[in-house]
């Protein structure tokens, strides 16, 4: 273990020891959620998940679900704003229990933090959930109207990075009926300074190239939503409609300087401008129906979701000019496609005893994509772009998954458990008539189990296990070259196999007076690890191809301590220390043993009744890549929130990376290639947000009459 990691671990353990000694020994551990001196915890726990209270994360103001998750140990955002958790960027995203119309980081950026009540992380999901996702499922629980009458919310934000966002939602609830309509428009920007040095050898020639400039990545969303809910307690019907457009551009503006062999003479300085844009016009409809069969609580549920992208286009553009402004090279790539996918589920819950539930279900998922890929190159003699007909590639892809599962959940005294088994039958078809085809049929089993034991003195222990997979989508399988920039090209792999994961974790949590301590040890075994491998493609040009790089173990420990040193100050310290063992099975990848970790120091201050301040410090240690290493860095965030008009209006101000210390420095090395990259986010990044929430309850709601989701106190209770 490196000295810096020893110091971090020692500091964290020392903090735990001090806080435990300083507290009373009276235990107040709860199974579901814990509050300290009446203040809801930032992170609470259930049998199979941890839950983050978005309202407690001030640094997420004006941000998205991505910013809320920064509070979680083991969460890291890279230089381009993509989220990884426990070393992986593969996870499923749900919104209110339904699969998101987008995936990964894009799905997290689609939901504004002001509209989020909680975020749930399921690292070992039960058998009733889909099996995709290396580190599990992230479920975003949005804010819902809880009383009868009108509920209106409006949220806006702007930042020094030219990020803008505005959303609004109107909800009306009356008796058994609830109607809502809303919309959002956002333009999220990510800017950074970029430098890279590469040494490549290809075809007997060598080159050392230098790049210096700026890179950006934006995410624009324009989505409308509406729905209707009917709930009598015996019958529940929910209809939700969403539609709109998403645009995801990224690119860079660089100066390139190249030295060529044999004497590494200095080449001409070139001016490069590269662009990528993914545009989608999407529509999604979902219908859910639940029928409660008896007073015991047995029920039948039926759900269906349909998503259709009537138009989706991936556009890539590379441009190379000399300093006189004359075009020397260039490409234009177009991948145009139509998507449609559908999910259906039928389940039956049997309460075979007061604490016991048996759930049986079947699910069906189908995803289809049809389109073509075209590219044209700049012809220097004719001074025009020329279509490359030999590279034209039409494609068709369809994946179907037919699933069945059984799961039991029960409680015996202080012991709570669930166990389940899922069967997936997969049908995978891909046809690229001009290149290749892929047809697969197979059936797999995915077990899961969770166990929780609650004691008065020792606290609560939970144990969870699940088997999961990462199945490659078509964008990872497409065997034609696309351009990230003129010196970096990417290609898919039609022979790519699925990655399989076994996840096991053991957690302990206990409250001592004003202090809550949580510790989680986890193990994750991955076979057929999917990752990009970089190799020399041409003189000064690299090619990133996606492969099954090898097998790996990740063993980690997460610790979080939350305490109140003073009535106006809540302190949370958390850390993640993991040991990674990767054994390469693909030529060009490097077997590695490494230790990585993160440390967070989160301070919440109550300056006045309606004024709050938050100051965070985060350290991210160095971590391995399949071909190299990324170095450690540290950053600090500062946020303030002011509440006005009896809680209806909130003003927020957030300064990210306030001391400008976040720097991303990575190295990749293999035969015939070495590269070193430096990325530094643009400074400053200051966000201003405003939120207005108005409720107008009906006369019936004001009188305290019973309704399904009302909250009651005093005599009405």
Region spans (language model):
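Transmembrane beta-barrel wall of Gram-negative outer-membrane proteins
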Residues: 162-190, 205-251, 277-295, 307
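Conserved C-terminal beta-signal and adjacent last beta-strands/turns
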Residues: 592-717
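Short acidic/polar hinge/loop motifs at secondary-structure boundaries
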Residues: 65, 98-123
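Short, acidic, small-residue-rich periplasmic hinge/interaction motif at the N-terminus
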Residues: 23-58, 78-80, 86-88, 122-124
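Extracytoplasmic beta-strand/coil segments of soluble accessory domains associated
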Residues: 66-99
């Amino acid at each position: 273990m490196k000295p810096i990691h020893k110091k971090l671990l020692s500091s964290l353990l020392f903090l735990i020891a001090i806080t435990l000694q300083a507290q009373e020994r009276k235990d107040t551990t709860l199974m579901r959620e814990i509050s300290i001196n009446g203040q809801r915890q930032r992170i609470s726990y259930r049998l199979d998940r941890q839950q983050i209270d978005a309202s407690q994360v001030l640094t997420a103001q004006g941000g998205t679900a991505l910013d809320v998750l920064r509070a979680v140990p083991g969460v890291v955002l890279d230089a381009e704003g993509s989220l990884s958790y426990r070393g992986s960027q593969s996870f499923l995203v749900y919104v209110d229990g339904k699969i998101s119309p987008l995936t990964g980081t894009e799905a997290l950026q689609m939901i504004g933090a002001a509209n989020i009540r909680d975020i749930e992380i399921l690292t070992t999901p039960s058998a009733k959930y889909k099996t995709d996702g290396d580190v599990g499922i992230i479920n975003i629980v949005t804010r819902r109207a809880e009383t009868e009458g009108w509920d209106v919310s409006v949220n806006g934000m702007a930042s020094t990075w030219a990020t803008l966002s505005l959303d609004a939602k109107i909800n009306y609830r009356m008796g058994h009926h609830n109607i809502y309509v809303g919309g959002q428009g956002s333009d999220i920007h990510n800017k950074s300074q970029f430098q890279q040095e590469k040494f490549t050898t290809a075809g007997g020639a060598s080159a050392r190239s230098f790049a210096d400039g700026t890179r950006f990545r934006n995410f624009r969303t324009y989505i409308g939503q509406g729905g209707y809910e009917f709930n009598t307690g015996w019958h529940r019907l929910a209809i939700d409609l969403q539609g709109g457009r998403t645009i995801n551009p990224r690119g860079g503006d660089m100066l390139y300087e190249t030295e060529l062999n044999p004497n590494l003479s200095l080449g001409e300085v070139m001016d490069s401008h590269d662009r990528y844009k993914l545009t989608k016009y999407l529509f999604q409809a979902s219908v859910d129906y639940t029928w409660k069969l008896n007073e015991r609580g047995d029920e039948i549920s039926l759900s269906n979701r349909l998503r259709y992208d009537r138009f989706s286009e991936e556009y890539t553009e590379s441009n190379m000019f000399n300093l006189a402004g004359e075009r020397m090279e260039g490409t234009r790539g177009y991948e145009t496609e139509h998507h449609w996918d559908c999910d259906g589920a039928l389940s039956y819950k049997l309460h075979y005893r007061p604490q016991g539930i048996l759930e049986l279900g079947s699910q069906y998922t189908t995803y289809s994509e049809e389109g073509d890929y075209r590219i044209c190159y700049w012809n220097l003699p004719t001074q025009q772009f020329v279509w490359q007909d030999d590279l034209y590639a039409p494609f068709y892809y369809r994946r179907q998954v037919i699933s069945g599962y059984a799961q039991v959940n029960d409680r015996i005294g202080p012991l709570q458990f669930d166990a389940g088994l899922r069967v997936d039958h997969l049908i995978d078809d891909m046809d690229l008539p001009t290149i290749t085809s892929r047809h697969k049929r197979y059936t797999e089993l995915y077990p899961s189990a969770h166990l929780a034991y609650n004691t008065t003195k020792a606290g609560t222990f939970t144990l969870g296990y699940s088997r999961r997979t990462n199945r490659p989508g078509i964008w990872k399988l497409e065997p034609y070259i696309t351009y990230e920039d003129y010196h970096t090209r990417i290609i898919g792999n039609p022979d790519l196999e699925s990655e399989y994961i076994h996840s096991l974790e053991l957690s302990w949590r206990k409250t001592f007076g004003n202090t809550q301590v949580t510790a989680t040890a986890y193990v994750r075994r991955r076979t057929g690890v999917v990752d990009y491998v970089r190799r020399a493609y041409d003189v000064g040009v690299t090619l990133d191809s996606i492969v099954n790089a090898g097998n790996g173990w990740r063993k980690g420990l997460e610790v979080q301590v939350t305490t109140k040193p003073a009535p106006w100050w809540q302190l949370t310290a958390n850390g993640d220390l993991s040991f990674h063992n990767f054994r390469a099975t693909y030529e060009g990848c490097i077997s590695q043993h490494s230790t990585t970790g993160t440390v967070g120091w989160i301070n919440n201050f109550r300056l006045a009744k309606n004024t709050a301040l938050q100051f965070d410090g985060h350290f991210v240690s160095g971590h391995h890549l399949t071909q190299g290493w990324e170095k450690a860095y540290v950053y600090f965030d500062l946020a303030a929130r002011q509440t006005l008009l009896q809680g209806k209006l909130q003003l927020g101000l957030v300064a990210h990376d306030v001391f400008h210390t976040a720097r991303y420095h990575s190295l990749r090395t293999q035969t015939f290639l070495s590269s070193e990259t430096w990325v530094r986010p643009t400074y400053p990044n200051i966000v201003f947000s405003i939120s207005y929430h108005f409720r107008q309850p009906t006369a019936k709601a004001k009188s305290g009459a019973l309704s399904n989701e009302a909250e009651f106190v005093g005599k009405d209770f």
